[in-house]
Amino acid sequence: MEKDKTFKYNTEIIGTTKVHSVKSDYKIRIKNEITYKGLEDDLYRFNIVESLYALDDYEDPIMTQIAEMTNRICSIYKEIEIGINAEGIIEKVFNRDQIRDKWQKVKAWLTNAHPLESYEVIRAKEFELSNEEMEIKNIRFIHFLHQYFFIFRQSVDSGGTKYIKKNEMDRFGAGVVIPVNINLREKDLENGAIERNYEGKMVRDNKVIERLRQFTKDNYMHPEYKMTGKYVYDNITLLESDFTITEELGEFYYNHSYLRLTLEE
């Protein structure tokens, strides 16, 4: 990837979420510009600017309100400059001051638009932004960033398989980190690009399962967390990706998201 060169990406997210008896389908379009800023202290520095975020479809009005608040909070990351290690993990955020300044405006909007509903949300976000380690940890789990860095620089001998362990965050706000075992495969394409495919399933960790059961108030449910993906690279430049995440916590909690990313010509 050429230093200081900007790449434009289009992302489409299609999904279904269910919480108790409320089930909603959603569709989101995102446009991002990503600039590689070079290697700094063994970290690959990237600037990411969101130029479009469109919630095209969300059926349930209550869920729409939640989505509206969530999207407004996420807007503080419309521009983010991050340092990625050789395993694709975010280790540093370079523009934290800019993010905190944006948060003050979002907090004022939340307080005026949704004073009761946003009280606990504001408290939690204030605490997170005051703690750099926690802030970086939560940014790591921003779902669309997976597309760019989930298997960044993870190479495999052609025809072979590589086994990786990753940590994922549950998608229902329980705050539970879910360990996932990944099987990664690679093949060379005729045009010189490299295609990497992976499958991932949660590790059956008893402590994690117990915390998820406490969250759902279901002592007998068996949680499932699965991931699949396909990435096409030219060196470290991502050309396209398909990414699917499915989480099911018993009868009443279900989320399935499909993310499709393409590089603009």
Range-by-range predicted roles:
Residues 90-201:
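Acidic, serine/threonine- and glycine-rich low-complexity intrinsically disordered segments
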Residues 1-84, 153-265:
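Acidic, serine/threonine-rich low-complexity disordered tracts
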Residues 85-88, 117-120, 259-261:
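Hydrophobic transmembrane alpha-helix bundles
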